[in-house]
């Protein structure tokens, strides 16, 4: 069972040649795996759906190349450990090809990194993106960065996204207003669930 997989505690898995791998979907689903794999070549991977869902993985994978990726659906859902190894480098991910980010950080209670730089212009589904997250585990500062960053990325219109009960502040109000604003007035018509201001 993958639930106990941790490569026998050896970091040697970091040396795997992954340059031709196309899918890493479900790879460490519900696994106790937590080895450094930040050096993996993910440049051809198109699917990372549920890759670390329900796992205890918490390593820095901020240098991964996601440029060919289209699915990060539930990638870290129910992973209560993941915070990119404490590094904000995940903000540098090229997610410009991703179309489905539904449940990506749902119930991911440790994740608290900025992702406002992500190019989310091709995402068509954000359903339950950060459902059940709170200000105890995601900062208003980082939510402000999402609102102010993503509102400049020309995202798809009419999307629904859930940030649990995370609050934003006046610093994020302008960005949120653009995302939720009417498409007739230059907004994107999003329906956003958050904890208010």
Segments from the language model and where they lie:
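Negatively charged
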Residues: 1-197
């Amino acid at each position: 069972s993958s639930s106990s997989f941790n490569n026998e505690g050896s970091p040697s898995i970091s040396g795997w040649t992954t340059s031709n791998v196309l899918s890493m979907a479900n790879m460490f689903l519900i696994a106790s795996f937590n080895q450094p794999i930040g050096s993996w070549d993910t440049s051809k991977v198109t699917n990372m759906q549920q890759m670390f869902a329900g796992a205890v993985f918490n390593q820095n994978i901020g240098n991964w190349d996601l440029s060919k990726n289209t699915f990060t659906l539930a990638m870290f859902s129910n992973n209560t450990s993941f915070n990119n190894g404490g590094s904000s480098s995940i903000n540098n991910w090229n997610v410009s090809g991703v179309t489905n980010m539904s449940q990506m950080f749902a119930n991911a209670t440790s994740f608290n990194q900025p992702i406002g730089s992500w190019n989310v212009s091709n995402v068509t589904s954000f359903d339950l993106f950060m459902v059940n997250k709170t200000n105890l585990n995601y900062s208003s500062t980082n939510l402000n960065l999402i609102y102010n960053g993503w509102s400049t990325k020309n995202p798809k219109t009419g999307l629904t996204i859930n940030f649990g009960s995370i609050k934003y502040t006046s610093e994020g109000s302008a960005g949120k207003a653009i995302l939720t604003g009417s498409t007739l007035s230059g907004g994107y018509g999003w329906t956003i669930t958050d904890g208010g201001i």
